[in-house]
Structure formats: C-alpha cells, structure tokens
Amino acid sequence: MARLKEIYRNEIAPKLKNELQLVNVMEVPRITKITLNMGLGEAVGDKKVIENAVADLEKITGQKPVVTYARKSIAGFKIREGWPIGVKVTLRRDRMYEFLDRLLSISLPRVRDFRGLNAKSFDGRGNYSMGVKEQIIFPEIDYDKIDALRGLDITLTTTARTDDEGRALLRAFNFPFRN
C-alpha cells in the first residue's frame, strides 16, 4: 500500500473527521483522482512533439497517456478538427498516492523560485488545480534527453463539498500553500 494512503487512513481521516465535525468516516473528504494534462499547441505541424510528450508523461506517471484531439477547427489557432493537440493521464488509487508523494517530497522543492502553491486555485467544489512550467522538475525526466521544456496542468479531484473542506484536506497532506 502507498505510504500516503496509509497516512490518510490512519492519521488524516480521523483528524479531519473531528476538525470538520463529521458523523461518518465516509463523509471525510478524500482525493479521488489526479489528472495531468499537457496542452501542445506547437504539435500542429510536427508529430514528433506528441510522441515526445507521451514519452515524458509516461515516465512521470508510470502510465500510458491518452492523446487528446481537437473537437472543432479553429482558424486562429491553425488547427483542424481531429488533429492531436495534447496528452492526458488520469491517476487513481495507489498510483495516485505514489505520484502525490513524489510531487510533494521531490518535485515541488525542485521548482525554481518556489514560494508555495496558490491557496486560491480551488474551483468552488473542493477540487484543486495547479500548473507546472517545466517537466524537468520530475526526477524521472533526464534533462539531456528532452527536446523542449513543456508545462503541464495537474488537477486533484476530491470528494470535498466546499473549497474550505478541500483546503483542509490538502493542508493535512502538507501541501506547501503560500498563505
């Protein structure tokens, strides 16, 4: 079992139950999935870009990403319907907790000029989104073998009903929030 999953079950869940004054353990907010998305606008003319992004995301997560395609043509962005424009991965269960552990303990401290995460990046329903400017903060990516620096979006979906519950959950996981 993943280290953070055990910590959640044994320490975080009972603490949050008391803190939020919940009756049932199943009411305690928990992280259901983590979605990583890499939007690749520059992939319009080059298939290699998609292949490299798929390889990078696969190294980071240990799971094969899905290529996302344009739903409709947009002349301003020079894309046509059905063209590949990004890659995404959804992590659940043990892989999700292992990725979260690596993100908090190894990757985020490697971000240049890191002052903490924005505590206001909640969506109103307890889900948290953050952006990473460079994929090289992950130790699985070899700096010498990358073709371009690419950013990615990380979304943590929780069962929290409000932003305050979600914030309490992520603070219990020791998320480094700014304020």
Curated annotation (Swiss-Prot):
Q: Which gene encodes it?
A: rplE
Subunit structure, interactors included: Part of the 50S ribosomal subunit; part of the 5S rRNA/L5/L18/L25 subcomplex. Contacts the 5S rRNA and the P site tRNA. Forms a bridge to the 30S subunit in the 70S ribosome.
The answer to whether the entry has keyword tRNA-binding is: yes
Query: What family does this chain come from, according to its entry?
Result: Belongs to the universal ribosomal protein uL5 family.
PROSITE patterns for the chain: RIBOSOMAL_L5
Instruction: Write out the function statement from the record.
Output: This is one of the proteins that bind and probably mediate the attachment of the 5S RNA into the large ribosomal subunit, where it forms part of the central protuberance. In the 70S ribosome it contacts protein S13 of the 30S subunit (bridge B1b), connecting the 2 subunits; this bridge is implicated in subunit movement. Contacts the P site tRNA; the 5S rRNA and some of its associated proteins might help stabilize positioning of ribosome-bound tRNAs.
A GO biological process held by the record = translation
Per the record, the domain of life is: Bacteria
Task: Look up the record and report any one GO term of the cellular component aspect.
Answer: ribonucleoprotein complex
What the entry lists under InterPro entries is as follows: Ribosomal_uL5, Ribosomal_uL5_bac-type, Ribosomal_uL5_C, Ribosomal_uL5_CS, Ribosomal_uL5_dom_sf, Ribosomal_uL5_N
Identify the SUPFAM superfamilies for this entry: RL5-like (SSF55282)
Q: Name one GO molecular function term.
A: rRNA binding
Q: Which UniProt keywords apply?
A: Ribonucleoprotein, Ribosomal protein, RNA-binding, rRNA-binding, tRNA-binding
What is the name of this protein? Large ribosomal subunit protein uL5
Tell me which PANTHER family the record gives.
60S RIBOSOMAL PROTEIN L11-RELATED
